Amino acid sequence: MEVIGAGFGRTGTSSLQAALEELLGGKCYHMKDIMMRPAQLKAWHEFALGKTSKMDWERLFAGYVAIVDCPVCIYYKEIMGIFPEAKIILTVRDSQSWWKSFNRLMSTVNKARLLCFLVPKLRKIAEFTDKIIIQDVFGGRLEKEHCIRIFERHNETVRKVVPKDRLLEYDVRQGWEPLCKLLEAPIPKQPFPHLNVGKRSLYKLFGQTVIHGFKRP
């Protein structure tokens, strides 16, 4: 494991995922992996519902060179102890901008909740994200001021907890250079992958999950 992402979702984690896969030449773990891979979903669902008391992080992330996005970022302190050589990247974003993106995501997710009754796998995603993210992180409250406070407090905690020689505070608008410096890698010739995961992309991902949900595991 070379990189652990400690930044919340909606801070450019899809762009970071693509960039790290290019620089490290391997797979980078993201929420999308959980949604599309039954074994990953099963592990997180059982963990969230208390069916397993402890997550086997090494087994969960076997085959990945980096991990980013929620719910990974919630457990960065525990995970960084398992992988002491890994660098920690805190993706940051203006708080107001983050809130707008997060709020749009929650609105899109709520509109798709009806599908949860039809697709068992989608229901499992809703159950584990509600427990781990909505309840455990945000205390079941999604008001703007409260969510921004939680977001900013998380970032401050990362800055205090992670040793400076392991931490990169990173805005994806900075492009390749900070990542390449951290990883001691040459700057790629191709443009940095600025991926905008908007409503269309989310609906496409939900659609793919629904299709997978109707397939036999």
Residue ranges, per PLM feature:
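PAPS-dependent sulfotransferase catalytic core
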Residues: 1-62
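Short active-site oxyanion
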Residues: 1-4, 63-66, 87, 164-168
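Short, well-ordered alpha-helical microsegments
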Residues: 13-14, 73-77, 99, 175-179
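PAPS-dependent sulfotransferase catalytic domain
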Residues: 25-29, 33, 48-61, 74, 77-169, 185
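Gly/lys/ser-thr-rich phosphate-binding loops in alpha/beta enzymes
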Residues: 55-90
